Structure formats: structure tokens, C-alpha cells
Amino acid sequence: MVIQHNIAAINSYRNLSINQNALSKNLEKLSSGYKINRAGDDAAGLAISETMRSQINGLNQAVNNANDAIGLIQTAEGAMTETHSMLQRMKTLTTQAANGTYTSTARGNIKAELDALNKEITRIATTTEFNGETPLKPATKDTPLTFFIGASADTTNAMTVEQKNMTAEELKVNDLKVSNTTAAFNSMASVDAAIEKVSTYRAQLGAAQNRLEHTVNNLKVTSENITSAESRIRDTDMADEITAYTKNNILLQAAQSMLSQSNAMPQGVLSMLQ
């Protein structure tokens, strides 16, 4: 037996330190909810997790972007519902005026209603706004709006939505004439062309909205799957970690007990000297 070096105590202290460190990590993981709290815990796992988080953030913002685009489309399409309704009324009035049975006074009344309708069409186009944009009267004629609907810097993730000027002047129904049957026939043709133009634009917006709704669904599913994968890499499995904590706590207590007994061993030398 030697007393200069207590190998048993040194060994017990080393194991005590190991168990203390392990227990501290268990507590950190349980309290934070993450099994990777620093690069030293899992360098590769942390890098993969951060890449996934970047992608998740991009996907979630892309969902917001797509929903904004849907909101703009719904705003524009809703306004054009009224434009369509007024154009249909214009069609009725011009068809009515094409009949030769109306007096000048009656035609004047029809003209007055047509003028009121064209002013309202222009007002709606001018005042329809979404987040500062006026899709039915863009600042620059027929300038598309671009929406970014993906998580990566790829041009395929950029989607454009056309903006069309839907004022009465642009639709060429701002000065419909019904003073005689010939003028009324010409006005009917102008109204028909305007109805077709509005119908075409509404169809384009409807197709874009359908695409965006599918895009939102796909983005949400992708985000959900990547979030689940990232969670498996980074989040603490509470059941496993509690089991490890219990084991390390028992080992720590055992190491403390063994260290105490190891430190008492040299005392046996004193009994030999008595």
C-alpha cells in the first residue's frame, strides 16, 4: 500500500468529473429542448439544421408572398365583377337604343345613364387598391407585378401577374353614342369588345389565383416536412434524455461514494503504525 499517490481516488475523481459533465449536458438539453446547443454537440448536425432552418424561413415567407398575391388578385377580380355588371347594363342600353322607336329625349336619357356608368367604371379602376398597388390602373400601362413564391434564389420561383388598365377610356366605353341607330350599333360593338377584354383578364387572374393556391398548399407541405426533419436532428428526445439523466445521476452518486471511500483508504496505514 502506498500513500504518496492514491490511484483509486484519482480514478474515482476522473469518473466523477465525467459523470458531472454528462449530467450537466443532460440538464442543458432537457431545459433548452435542444440536443444541439452549440457546434461542439454535433458540428455536422448543427450545419444541416441551420441550412434547413434557412429553407423553412424562406418557405414560410413564400407562403406569405403567395397569399399577398392571392389577396391582390381577389381585390382586382372583385372590382371587375362590378365592371362586368355595368358593361352588361351598357350592352342592354345600347341594344335598346339601336331600336328605331326611341325619340331624341329617350336617347338622351339612355346617354345620360351610359355616361354615369362609364364614370363609375373609371372610378372603380382608379380606386381599387391593394397595399399601395392599383392593379386596375397601374402607374405604367400593362406592367406586371412579380411575386416571389419559393425558398431559393431561382428565377423559376418568380411569378408575374399582369396588371391591366380597366378604366372606361382604356375599355373604349367612355364616350358611347346613341343619338341614332347607327351610332348605337357602333356602341354595341364597343361594349362587346370591352366585355370580352374584362372577361379575358378575369380568366387570367382566376388561373393565376388557382396556381397560387396550389403553390401555397405545396409550400406548406414542404415546410412541414422539413420542419419535422430539422426537429429530429436538433430537438431533444425527452424520453431518451430523461433516461440518460437518470443513469448519469446514479453514476455520479456512485462516483461520489467511491471517491469518499478511496480517500479513506490511506487512513489504514495509520492503524499499521499504531
Residue spans for each PLM region:
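Primary detection of the long, small/polar-rich alpha-helical "axial" segments characteristic
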Residues: M1-Q274
